[in-house]
Amino acid sequence: MEFIGVIVLAILIYLYVMMKKPGENIKQISTNELKSLFGNTDKQFIDVRTQGEFKQNHIRHFKNMPLQSLQQHAHKLSKNKEIIVICQSGMRSASACKVLKKQGFTTVTNVKGGMNSWSD
């Protein structure tokens, strides 16, 4: 009986870790690394926060494409350019990267720490 409990616990830990991972083959960059990418025409910058969050404070290089409507608007993005994704903390942007990967975008990058880590 104790063995079954250990197995169940191991499965729960595995599922938790898998849910917390930002995704396979998703590059992570810091906000300091992000600054060096501005002006690069081979990059697309999207902010997946809500419109209200975006209006309150955003980085001028980023286009607002809220996570909840990302699947409907992903066709506006080029699959030939890298997509840099940001949110408030890095969690929604990690989810957005997974969504984009599933839709066939091969080069997506998550900004670690999101706007919480940003400073001009």
Identify what each model region corresponds to:
Residues 1-44, 48-56:
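Flexible, polar/low-complexity N-terminal or interdomain linker segments that lie immediately upstream
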Residues 27, 63, 89:
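Charged, low-complexity surface patches
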Residues 29, 65, 111:
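Hydrophobic residues at beta-strand termini and immediately following loops
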Residues 44, 61-63, 107-109:
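Conserved beta-strand segments of alpha/beta enzyme cores
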Residues 48-50, 67, 113:
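Active-site loop/turn elements of alpha/beta-hydrolase fold enzymes
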Residues 52-84:
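Extracytoplasmic/periplasmic/luminal assembly and interaction segments
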Residues 57, 119-120:
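Short Asp/Glu-rich motifs
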Residues 71, 77-119:
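Catalytic cysteine-centered active loop of the rhodanese-like fold, especially the PTP/DSP P-loop
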